[in-house]
Amino acid sequence: MDGTEIAVSPRSLHSELMCPICLDMLKNTMTTKECLHRFCSDCIVTALRSGNKECPTCRKKLVSKRSLRPDPNFDALISKIYPSREEYEAHQDRVLIRLSRLHNQQALSSSIEEGLRMQAMHRAQRVRRPIPGSDQTTTMSGGEGDPGEGEGDGEDVSSDSAPDSAPGPAPKRPRGGGAGGSSVGTGGGGTGGVGGGAGSEDSGDRGGTLGGGTLGPPSPPGAPSPPEPGGEIELVFRPHPLLVEKGEYCQTRYVKTTGNATVDHLSKYLALRIALERRQQQEAGEPGGPGGGASDTGGPDGGGGEGGGAGGGDGPEEPALPSLEGVSEKQYTIYIAPGGGAFTTLNGSLTLELVNEKFWKVSRPLELCYAPTKDPK
């Protein structure tokens, strides 16, 4: 022994220590007596019992198990190279389990996506087209009803099991509509798309809701598929151009969230955000400002400094600041514009993943509009 070291690549080393049958590292090595090929003991015994009486590598005749002999020297060599054999096998098992679980999740997601797409394609054939020149807004039934039911008074037709049924395409809006064509009616129905049953009664004056299976038109075959389900979704949050005053909520917000977030989550986030911004603006104002104004108008004899101090102490202190305890997702209603200048109310139970799948446009983020709800209750 002259101490010479020979460099061996991991690939060639692994090929020498690999069983040709199971393609894993040799375990309880058995060597054929004639051709000297090595196999795992369990692998070669199973092969011989199955009736294959030949060497799996060179096809030489192997009469029985007597044609094999154990090779403890090779097992000792493997234990020297890989002293932590059990740790290696445990790591390999963990990798296989993770790959199997990931593959199953991807298969489930693709199956659900394909099922939703097929349902949307079938439901598109049941959409009734509105009569030109009429003010009624016609929507598709949520599931069990006949296409001829509920064709009067411009009411939305929605199933009682709207949250459980898969969403369908939205109807086309009549061009010559009056009050019925606006996004929010002049009546007191403020929660249109949030509730399942009561919301459908008040949503007749809205441009269609997504609560009873009235989602937007399905993506045509061959169109680019939306982002991967369960991933992050980027959306643009704009104030409603018709329902929000110019100087009140003129801020466009850019939000990035997960696909399993619902429309109610967005409404609650928006209400909290606006309440916090108002609170910060009022707290950042000059102290005694509101009170000073009240004192100056009430007592003409008081000086500027004293009047301001007295007014700041006697005026309302905390009620002017918005409370965060009463913030609710029903304070704001979320809309989406499918096209043609029409706005559709989004149901609060819908996930952003489902909304993005129906209304996503290529190379553009999802755009939503918000406006204060007239009647939050």
From Swiss-Prot:
Motif Nuclear localization signal, chain ranges: 172-175
Query: Which portions of the sequence form the region Disordered?
Result: 119-234, 280-325
Q: What is its main location?
A: nucleus
Task: Please state the residue ranges covered by RING-type zinc fingers.
Answer: 19-59
Q: Using the UniProt annotation, give all residue ranges assigned to the region (Necessary for interaction with CBX2).
A: 201-377
Q: What biological processes does GO assign it?
A: chromatin organization; negative regulation of DNA-templated transcription; protein ubiquitination
Residue ranges with Gly residues bias:
176-199, 206-215, 286-314
| MF GO annotations | chromatin binding; ubiquitin protein ligase activity; zinc ion binding
Composition skew (Pro residues), residue ranges: 217-229
Q: Which UniProt keywords apply?
A: Chromatin regulator, Metal-binding, Nucleus, Phosphoprotein, Repressor, Transcription, Transcription regulation, Transferase, Ubl conjugation pathway, Zinc, Zinc-finger
What positions are modified (Phosphoserine)? 9, 111, 158, 161, 200, 203, 219, 225
Q: Kindly indicate whether the keyword Transmembrane helix belongs to this entry.
A: no
SUPFAM superfamilies registered for this protein in UniProt: RING/U-box
Query: Annotated region Necessary for transcriptional repression: where?
Result: 1-205
- Positions where Phosphothreonine occurs in the chain: 186, 191
Pathway the protein takes part in = Protein modification; protein ubiquitination
Q: Where in the cell is it found?
A: Nucleus speckle
Q: What does this protein do?
A: Constitutes one of the E3 ubiquitin-protein ligases that mediate monoubiquitination of 'Lys-119' of histone H2A, thereby playing a central role in histone code and gene regulation. H2A 'Lys-119' ubiquitination gives a specific tag for epigenetic transcriptional repression and participates in X chromosome inactivation of female mammals. Essential component of a Polycomb group (PcG) multiprotein PRC1-like complex, a complex class required to maintain the transcriptionally repressive state of many genes, including Hox genes, throughout development.
Q: What is this protein called?
A: E3 ubiquitin-protein ligase RING1
Organism of origin: Gorilla gorilla gorilla (Western lowland gorilla)
Recorded name of the encoding gene:
RING1
